Structures are given as structure tokens and as C-alpha cells.
UniProtKB/Swiss-Prot annotation:
Its main location: secreted. One of its GO terms (biological process) is sensory perception of chemical stimulus. Pfam families: PBP_GOBP (PF01395). InterPro entries: PBP/GOBP, PBP_GOBP_sf. Present only in a small number of hairs scattered over the surface of the funiculus. Residues 1-24 form the signal peptide. SMART domains: PhBP. GO terms for molecular function: odorant binding; pheromone binding. Disulfide bonds join C103-C151, C140-C160. This is General odorant-binding protein 84a.
Length: 175
């Protein structure tokens, strides 16, 4: 009789605790071997709550421009003001940091693969900068050819690319 009472209490305790334990387990991410799955009832939208063990596939010619920017800016510290002015006008301000900014843009084009040994990667330039037409690529590669300073020569090519891109953009407005 005593053992039947203990067994009945154990069954009642189990029935009471089971739903609470199951609910607690559902609130934790589960590992299906590849991706952590979250119970969306408890997901608050915070990116930190999501993690994965596999990276997303990338295109063969993918360029991580943020990483390139960090690497080049570590060596050639360039203000965002100079970068934005160059991106909008094709010119750098005449200040004490102009040569450093020239080296930054040369570095950026080299490290991103847009240019290698003063030769433009036509596919990447067309994909990321502007759809170069005619002899634009060859004309830009010829810029600064007599320049002995690597930064100056690279910058001359980059400036040509941006100037032509900006000119094309102004002449062909988008709808």
C-alpha cells in the first residue's frame, strides 16, 4: 500500500513537471548538426540570437570591400571626407593628406582585385565601378605611365576610372 502511494506521487510529480521541462527545452537553440534553430516564439529579433556553423556561398569574384577598406586604411589613414569627396567628384582636396589618400586608393584597387600591376580587371571594374565602354580601360591604364611613384601612378589610373564613371553617370541619368 505504501509503495503504491509513493508510485502515485511520483507519477503525479512527473505529470506536473513534464510540460514545464519540455517548454524550457524548447526555448533553447537546438543543433541539427549544421545550423542552430531557434524557437521563434522566444526570438526577439536580435542578430546575436542567430548563429550558424556554415558560411553562405559567395560568388567567385566576390570582393569584401569593408575588409579591403580596413586593410588599406590601416596603412594609409584616409578620412571619410576625402573618400566621399573623391567618390563624388573624382578629385581629392589639396591638403597635407593628399599623398596618403592617393596611396589609399591605389591600395584599395590593388587589394580588391580591381587592378593588378597597373592593369585593370575589366570584369570587376564593370561589375563594381562602372560599365566601361570603348577604349576606356586601355586609356585609364595608360594614365601615369611615366610616373615612378607607385601611389601616384596607381592613383592616376583610379582617378581616370572614377572621372569616366562620374562623367558617364552624369550623361546617362537613371530613371
Amino acid at each position: 500500500m505504501y509503495s503504491a502511494l509513493v508510485r502515485a506521487c511520483a507519477v503525479i510529480a512527473f505529470l506536473i513537471l513534464s510540460p514545464n521541462c519540455a517548454r524550457a527545452l524548447q526555448d533553447h537553440a537546438k543543433d541539427n548538426g549544421d545550423i542552430f534553430i531557434i524557437n521563434y516564439d522566444s526570438f526577439d529579433g536580435d542578430v546575436d540570437d542567430i548563429s550558424t556553423t556554415t558560411s553562405a556561398p559567395r560568388e567567385a569574384d566576390y570582393v569584401d570591400f569593408d575588409e579591403v577598406n580596413r586593410n588599406c586604411n590601416a596603412s594609409f589613414i584616409t578620412s571619410m571626407t576625402n573618400v566621399l569627396q573623391f567618390n563624388n567628384t573624382g578629385d581629392l582636396p589639396d591638403d597635407k593628406d593628399k599623398v596618403t589618400s592617393m596611396c589609399y586608393f591605389h591600395c584599395f584597387f590593388e587589394k580588391s582585385g580591381l587592378m593588378t600591376d597597373y592593369k585593370l580587371n575589366t570584369d570587376l571594374v564593370r561589375k563594381y565601378v562602372w560599365p566601361a565602354t570603348g577604349d576606356s580601360v586601355e586609356a585609364c591604364e595608360a594614365e601615369g605611365k611615366d610616373e615612378t611613384n607607385a601611389c601616384m601612378r596607381g592613383y592616376a589610373i583610379v582617378k581616370c576610372v572614377f572621372t569616366r564613371a562620374l562623367t558617364d553617370a552624369r550623361n546617362k541619368p537613371t530613371v
